[in-house]
Amino acid sequence: MNLRIVYLRSLNIQGLTKMTDDKNNLLHRGLDNIQPPFSNFIRAQATASVFLLVATITALWWANSDYSSTYQMLKHMQIGFFLGDIELQASLKHIINDGLMVIFFFFIGLEIKREVLAGDLAIAENRRMLILCALGGMICPAVIYSLFNWSLDSQIGWGIPMATDTAFALGALTLVRKHIPISLLAFLVGLAIVDDVGAIVVIALFYTQEISVIFLSISFSLIAFLAIANYAGVLRPIFYILIGIAAWWTMLKSGVHPTFAGVAIALTVPARPMLPPDELLSKVKAKITAMKKNKGHQLDALANREDHEQVLDVRDFAEHGSAPLRRWEDALDLPVSLFVLPLFALVNAGVEVSFSSLIETLQHSVGLGIVIGLVIGKFVGISGACWLGLRYKIGSLPEGINMQHVIGMSLIAGIGFTMSTFIATLGFDSQPEYLQSAKGSILFASLLSAILGLLYLRIIAAKKAPNSASKNGEN
């Protein structure tokens, strides 16, 4: 949590003076004035799902309206500039898919690193169960798709049903939040993060065509340089931004999809603050003591220059006392949720929707493999892996969660919209017929998974676990 925000929200002269009696008072007062971080995260994800839904509906309407030609023109509109003999331009769709989506994957990388260092993945027992469930939820859908497309040129799409859309899945779960334990939401977040790791590895290894060893070596060298700089204590954001852009560009030129660079660069972002907690509290306490001695007037950072500088000092202490990784993650949360992902949905979700096209999609091996992979494969893979993990004591479920909750969550995990669509655009970029079928089936499977999961959690799981549901409803 950003201590600067906590401090500024709770700042008043009476609250400051009390810190001299209790060195933790500032933190406690700030924490009391805001929602728990995970609740804020859930709310942000639910909001993101609304924006994604609006963008998706807009794309579907646009692509099926009388203005569909303008939709296609927008997607393929060339954007760029000329500088002498240098020409840099690309279609809007490629700019979003190869450029803006790197920011999304960078954000995912920050989440992964935080979870491994300080989240559920930092606890061995939780980590084992999450990884086991995620592997089941990736392998089973991929196998099902491959069975339907064995020896066909569409077999390359086996990675499409492996993914879960975190924003949409969490948004769906919040609709039945009163009937499920809050720990189920946290479990889904951890599961989705491991799922994202798997999807990123699949993209890097199996959805890359020709590779330039020279550019790839340069990119990895730059990323290694960032890792060394992190170890050496370099914390300047501009340093990581400039070197990171160079690493992204060279990876793009190498042939490996640049989203992999986004994740790799994120893993080099410093996770430790410049000021250790004890030193931070000591400096803040000393500054507040100095402010307390000035009893001639009320704190006025606008009218009084000295007060202004003292408040800025505390702000700087807070900046140095928070982890860059967490600050960057917080800073990117809204831009990614409200801008990057909706734009991606807008240019990629526009497919022809009709009863006849749906029937045609479900008769195609691509569509059938994706729908059954997401709806049935995710359910069987996640819940089956969880049952095996409990049966053989490989791991345990968080408190308040039972198998009925896991079954409902595994159905909702079949919502694979963003990442599944992204993998489809990579696998079927030169096969527009397959791509159209894949996009339509992803939408249908995601909608069906959401309906089945919500009905199960609302009707069956809630009845079998009334105590946990009622307790959660009181929170």
From Swiss-Prot:
The keyword Transmembrane applies. It catalyses: Na(+)(in) + 2 H(+)(out) = Na(+)(out) + 2 H(+)(in). GO terms for cellular component: plasma membrane. GO terms for molecular function: sodium:proton antiporter activity. One of its GO terms (biological process) is regulation of pH. It is a multi-pass membrane protein. The chain crosses the membrane at residues 44-64, 92-112, 130-150, 156-176, 186-206, 211-231, 232-252, 255-275, 331-351, 368-388, 406-426, 442-462. Disulfide bonds: none annotated. Keywords: Antiport, Cell inner membrane, Cell membrane, Ion transport, Membrane, Sodium, Sodium transport, Transmembrane, Transmembrane helix, Transport. It is found in: Cell inner membrane. The keyword Hydrolase does not apply. Belongs to the NhaA Na(+)/H(+) (TC 2.A.33) antiporter family. This is Na(+)/H(+) antiporter NhaA 2.
